[in-house]
Amino acid sequence: SIELSLLLSVPASLGLIIASEEIINALFGYGSFSKENVSMTSEALTWFGYGIPAFSLIKVLSNFFFARNNTTTPFYISLFVVTLNVIISLSFFKEVGFIIIPISTSISTWVGVLIYTYLLNRYSFLILQKSIIKNIFKIISSAVLMSFVLLHGLEYFEESLNFVNKFKAIYLLFIVSFVATIYLITCYLLGILKIKNYKIN
């Protein structure tokens, strides 16, 4: 479950970090939604992108406690994460502005992941085998390769993704589809994705 979580969340995270402006521009860059609105919204999306793996992992890691009928620990961790989020947001809102909200959300969630990881290792609830660590490295490597392809794709279609282009969403969809295909092929070649594991009986 950890591998599957990272398999989906790591490329999604890098994709949002790299192409946040193009995504917001393609989806909402029309009419009264100005370039300034696109810039501000994409900045927030970028910071949320940093937290995507944590958002995914924290749900997976909490299940190790739920499976043992331990609901108290996840509750207190969630309470701490929310409290930390609020404290960071209120402490820096005047200096940083609205952008502190996605920043604090990502930071606090990653702290929650670290707490879960520490406790799971302490109680020996989670033992990462070498094969899992190896696959995690492969996932990250595949996602990094995907990021390079995405960067070159955005650069190549820069004019087509311009704010004033009415068909920018189509070009972005093409880029995303191509990049996702490259990522899946890379994962398959590295042995992360195995078709036999996804056959429907």
Regions found by a protein language model. Name each.
Residues 1-201:
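Membrane-embedded alpha-helical bundles of multi-pass transporters/translocases
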